[in-house]
Amino acid sequence: MLIHPQFDPVAIHLGPLAIRWYGLMYLAGFIMFLGFGRLRIRQPHIAAKGWTTRDLDDMLFFGVLGVILGGRLGYVLFYKPSYYLAHPLEILKVWEGGMAFHGGFLGVVVAMWLFGKLRRRHWMEVTDFIAPMIPCGLAAGRIGNFINGELWGRATDLPWGMIFPQAGDNIPRHPSQLYQFAGEGVALFIVLWLFARKPRPMGAVSGVFLIGYGAFRFAAEFAREPDNFLGLLALKLSMGQWLSLPMILAGIAMVVWAYRRQPGAGASQPVA
């Protein structure tokens, strides 16, 4: 049995300024996105499409806005709609927490669609480019969850079961944040990076991301404690699982569409 070390959520104290671990994890995710993005630009089939480091920087800016706005609205709509309907001003208090990946994902899709319009590129060409780097941010975020001792797992008697003091029940639980770090972070990054090293039909890389994330998240939710204000829903599945199922189905549809539309590897064309 292990005990969560209860890290100080503030990593650096600079007088009145407090820099939190979770903020540093966001920063680490952005740095990895830019670093691996620059490596991706050098791949011959990517360089042939004219991607530049300026595009990468601009995509990060658009993506951050999409994550924040979409993540917050997703949490409001998917998890606590009645509460925020009664307290609408609370929606603005993002510093108090409350973000949803699935909402952030939709926000990024909209942001990349807008970016594509500005650059005269199809939105799926944009998402195909960024998909292999997204797991870097997911991995960093899950480490942030673990450091904060939040989003712990269900009770377990496995040797690596961990007591999370913030749970308040002294029960060993799955360190589900680390499961998600390993699955939707490390493993998904490896799969996508290897898959995207070769030219693929437009939409294929994005589709594989949807399938991979949805599958890893769906599986990890069996070890993760459901949100106490929601519990388990129909078929004893969590909200995270129900939101992941459409991602898996959409990913399968995108991959099938991509290969039927462009057999073999094909380069996408800019939109007019």
UniProtKB/Swiss-Prot annotation:
Q: Where, in this chain's numbering, is a 1,2-diacyl-sn-glycero-3-phospho-(1'-sn-glycerol) bound?
A: 142
Which InterPro entries does the UniProt entry name for this protein? Answer: Lgt
Which EC numbers characterise this protein's activity in its record? 2.5.1.145
Q: In which pathway does it act?
A: Protein modification; lipoprotein biosynthesis (diacylglyceryl transfer)
| UniProt entry keywords in alphabetical sequence | Cell inner membrane, Cell membrane, Membrane, Transferase, Transmembrane, Transmembrane helix
Q: Does the keyword Transferase apply?
A: yes
Where it sits in the cell: the answer is: Cell inner membrane
Question: What GO molecular functions are on record for this protein?
Answer: phosphatidylglycerol-prolipoprotein diacylglyceryl transferase activity
Q: What does this protein do?
A: Catalyzes the transfer of the diacylglyceryl group from phosphatidylglycerol to the sulfhydryl group of the N-terminal cysteine of a prolipoprotein, the first step in the formation of mature lipoproteins.
Descriptive protein name: Phosphatidylglycerol--prolipoprotein diacylglyceryl transferase
Q: Which organism is it from?
A: Cupriavidus necator (strain ATCC 17699 / DSM 428 / KCTC 22496 / NCIMB 10442 / H16 / Stanier 337) (Ralstonia eutropha)
* Gene expressing this chain: lgt
